[in-house]
Amino acid sequence: MSRPLTKVTQQGDRIAIVSGLRIPFAKQATSYHDIPAVDLGKSVVSELVTRSGLLPEKIDQLVFGQVVQMPEAPNIAREIVLGAGLSVSTDAYSVSRACATSFQAIANVAESIMAGTVNIGIAGGADSSSVLPIGVTKSLARTLVEMNKAKTLSQRLKLLSRLKFRDLLPVSPAVAEYSTGLRMGDTAEQMAKTYRISREDQDALAHRSHILAAKAWEQGLLVDEVMTAHFPPYREALLEDNNIRKNSVLTSYAKLRPAFDRKYGTVTAANSTPLTDGAAAVILMRESVAKALGTKPLGYLRSYAFSAIDVWQDMLLGPSYATPIALDRAGITLKDLTLIDMHEAFAAQTLANLKMFASDEFARNKLGRAQAIGEVDMDKFNVLGGSIAYGHPFAATGARMVTQVLNELRRRGGGLGLTTACAAGGLGTAMVLEVE
């Protein structure tokens, strides 16, 4: 085990996470059909600040992320500052780390606090899979640029005459890795085959996720961390996540056909997370500032780690690479954790990572460690369900997970929690949280 790295300021202040909030997550093209990510982000940040009681001018920094970026608002963070009632002097910049984006935003604000340049900051993310940047073909794009430089009507008409009908068709956003051409589902299929994850086990995990998430809502465990969403034209409000199967039946999962490998595959729409719209954010501050304000933190950021692996094979193993580092930096072991929350991009990916947590062979050959970090106690794992049930607005998932784990730790009287996620590009992240 490497030497622990304490996440404190030069004055010895811990990084306090004092509150977190999200809007209900909605399946693509449902409740937020016409609402861009920037408006989802403005909504949650505005409500988060209002509930916190903080004066807007006290917020030094906002770091926010968006994975499916809109060309007209490339710096979503600054647009949120300007549109959510914050002070115009609040520093703001945007980040993107695929599905780990809001983890990165949290880390960035934490590092600003540790550096002494920020006392209070907001971190989060928003994404819309319903309002997408629809592109044009390369031929049309080039022609439009050249037309802008053309000086006469005849020159413009000549340029247009070169175009064919297919050049005028819209281009949807890419759903595959830029460097490999592989879709996320293709990678999930790779992992199912490599680590021998059965269809039955995948379906069982998905069913478990929906059952636990439905129970969490039924018991009122999420009401304080999920706001009511009400967007123009204000005809209806969304109070809960709309992807959760409240009456999930395990046998129904077997009826779906594979979504990626049609002939031999096991990954289906039901054991994968759906395309989702949503936003989430957290407020971080120096521990001494929280005390001065009389604010009781939800918890503290104990450690974090990021990882990167090759993208061609099984690239969604990020949690298996990042978690051992985060545990070492926190000075703890897997057994010390009260809760473990892993992003469920796919049931196959989740189960593969759980296997690698317990694999001594993987630890020796891939991590250079003498032994595995250990087998996960499923009574501690994704106890309120996971992304398969809640949905996955790419940049918002990390902030959802952090807030959810901190609140659950408080209900249990404190302890240590792990949040971890895979991400496109072979990336991964893990954060250790502490509640007293």
Curated annotation (Swiss-Prot):
Pathway: Lipid metabolism; fatty acid beta-oxidation
One GO MF term attached to the UniProt entry: acetyl-CoA C-acyltransferase activity
Lineage: superkingdom: Bacteria
A single GO BP: fatty acid beta-oxidation
One GO CC term, this protein: cytosol
Catalytically driven reaction(s): an acyl-CoA + acetyl-CoA = a 3-oxoacyl-CoA + CoA
Pfam family of the protein (one): Thiolase_C
EC number: 2.3.1.16
Cell compartment(s), UniProt: Cytoplasm
InterPro entries, alphabetized: 3-ketoacyl-CoA_Thiolase, Ac-CoA_C-AcTrfase_FadI, Thiolase, Thiolase-like, Thiolase_acyl_enz_int_AS, Thiolase_AS, Thiolase_C, Thiolase_CS
SUPFAM superfamilies: Thiolase-like (SSF53901)
Catalytic residue list: 99, 392, 422
Keywords, sorted A to Z: Acyltransferase, Cytoplasm, Fatty acid metabolism, Lipid degradation, Lipid metabolism, Transferase
CDD domains documented for this protein: thiolase
Family per record: Belongs to the thiolase-like superfamily. Thiolase family.
Subunit structure, interactors included: Heterotetramer of two alpha chains (FadJ) and two beta chains (FadI).
Function: Catalyzes the final step of fatty acid oxidation in which acetyl-CoA is released and the CoA ester of a fatty acid two carbons shorter is formed.
Protein name as catalogued: 3-ketoacyl-CoA thiolase
